Amino acid sequence: MDFILNISVKMEVIFKTDLRSSSQVVFHAGSLYTWFSIEIINSGRIVTTAIKTLLNTVKYDIVRSARVYAGQGYTEQQAQEEWNMILHVLFEEETESSASLESIHEKNDHEKNDHEIDECTSSFETLFEQEPSSTETPKNAKLYALAQKTVQHIEQYGKAPDFNKIIRAHNFIQTIHGTPLKEEEKEEVRLMVIKLLKKK
């Protein structure tokens, strides 16, 4: 319970102080993932679900607060998009309105999305749905190198179930070097990471 309260306090402070800046929000989302990922893995999915419920409660305050900054060029739509990014970075969440994520260093260049953000649904169960074929060869050396770096990053955390390794890999891909990949590139690297981890 202390763990949940700790997250609650930190999330509240971050969202209330940094909502206006896209780069800061995404940066702190990545920081939160780093701070809590080990404890989330050790505590199991029950704790993860509890945190998700907590964050969804906070979500509505974040979206409402965006109206305060509308005069500064910060819209409710941008708040919704950033919330999508935050959940994706923290818990490997997918939404219907997921757009390609941009560099966290670009504060005011947001891609518009005409769809409403739907309820975030966990993709935990589908992580292994699509696996690379045994004959697959890297078509993009840069992406393959990124996959190798991602695997090295995962191994630095010590032993963890393969299930969680993939989650960590996918989240790390989102924020590596502050430049999230395009959706098709992200999927390509994800498959490479799965293949590399299976060889371990």
Curated annotation (Swiss-Prot):
Its main location: host cell. Phosphorylated on serine residues in the 115 N-terminal amino acids. Induction: Expressed in the early phase of the viral replicative cycle. It is found in: Host cytoplasm; Host nucleus; Virion. The keyword Phosphoprotein applies. One of its GO terms (cellular component) is host cell cytoplasm. It comes from the Viruses. Coiled coil: none annotated. Keywords: Early protein, Host cytoplasm, Host nucleus, Host-virus interaction, Phosphoprotein, Virion. Modifies the subcellular distribution of heterogeneous nuclear ribonucleoprotein K (HNRNPK) and may contribute to modulate HNRNPK functions related to processing and export of mRNAs during ASFV infection. Necessary for virus internalization. Belongs to the asfivirus phosphoprotein p30 family. Oligomer. Interacts with host HNRNPK. This is Phosphoprotein p30.
